[in-house]
Amino acid sequence: MSNETIKVVIAGPRGRMGQEAVKLAVRTPHFELVGAIDHTYDQQTLREVMSADSDALIYTDIRACFQETKPDVLIDLTTPEIGKKHTKAALEHGVRPVVGTTGFSEADLEELQALTEEKGIGAIIAPNFALGAVLMMKFSQMAANYFEDVEIIELHHDQKLDAPSGTALKTAEMISSVRTEKQQGHPDEKEILPGARGAELNGIRLHSVRLPGLIAHQEVMFGMDGQTLKLRHDSYNRASFMSGVKLSVEQVMKIDQLVYGLENIID
């Protein structure tokens, strides 16, 4: 990576992930934090609003932000619906989006891919920015070549709105790409309580836990006669996601297409 400065705007700077992203942008020598997008505090600085070490202005209008700050990259750490709008607006303005929200449908991704091709710029959407979680997904895909029986348990803080998590869904999709679809469990099993066996994707069972005290955790459990294999990743704080955010900001400057999943930009 060259030392050329990358101008960054952060959407959702006051959220827990957003606060970490602000710190990342401030402390990274070749990043320049030129603005932020929030639904309040228009034209106030990050220093005034959240005591950040930055005088970048907050904008409530994303288009005004792009026009005035001329960023290279948008880091979006908002919510699924807002993230979709921000991602499209960024591409329309020639800004490369790095998106940490989930909930994009196949139709959404196709539309965004067409926009990246039209504009000739890159975009990265990552269900999980923790490099360890991405490796867990890749290792799970490898293991699925040898273990056809698998279930996924994801555990998150109790303020998370979506279930199962984007990481769990992405893991199941990656496993499905190398595994012949198989109905998990006994063919005649019966749920005494509806939902007891979890959600299902391509025959893979997914289970979601929501509790205070958790951050982001996932275990992929494989079974075979006489043995089990467990692959687990734990994020103990949100700083764990910043290595992936940094990598994505750097890599999105080098690509001219939509990339979904951090596993597609690491060797």
Curated annotation (Swiss-Prot):
PROSITE patterns: DAPB. Keywords: Amino-acid biosynthesis, Cytoplasm, Diaminopimelate biosynthesis, Lysine biosynthesis, NAD, NADP, Oxidoreductase. It catalyses: (S)-2,3,4,5-tetrahydrodipicolinate + NAD(+) + H2O = (2S,4S)-4-hydroxy-2,3,4,5-tetrahydrodipicolinate + NADH + H(+); (S)-2,3,4,5-tetrahydrodipicolinate + NADP(+) + H2O = (2S,4S)-4-hydroxy-2,3,4,5-tetrahydrodipicolinate + NADPH + H(+). Pathway: Amino-acid biosynthesis; L-lysine biosynthesis via DAP pathway; (S)-tetrahydrodipicolinate from L-aspartate: step 4/4. (S)-2,3,4,5-tetrahydrodipicolinate binds at H157, G166, T167. GO terms for cellular component: cytosol. It holds the Pfam family DapB_C. Its EC number is 1.17.1.8. NAD(+) binds at G12, P13, R14, G15, R16, M17, G100, T101, T102, A126, P127, N128, F129. Gene3D superfamilies: Dihydrodipicolinate Reductase, domain 2 (3.30.360.10), NAD(P)-binding Rossmann-like Domain (3.40.50.720). The active site is at H156, K160. GO terms for molecular function: 4-hydroxy-tetrahydrodipicolinate reductase; NAD binding; NADP binding; oxidoreductase activity, acting on CH or CH2 groups, NAD or NADP as acceptor. GO terms for biological process: diaminopimelate biosynthetic process; lysine biosynthetic process via diaminopimelate. It is found in: Cytoplasm. NCBIfam families: dapB. Belongs to the DapB family. Catalyzes the conversion of 4-hydroxy-tetrahydrodipicolinate (HTPA) to tetrahydrodipicolinate. PANTHER family: 4-HYDROXY-TETRAHYDRODIPICOLINATE REDUCTASE 1, CHLOROPLASTIC-RELATED, DIHYDRODIPICOLINATE REDUCTASE. This is 4-hydroxy-tetrahydrodipicolinate reductase. The lineage of its organism: Bacteria, Bacillati, Bacillota, Bacilli, Bacillales.
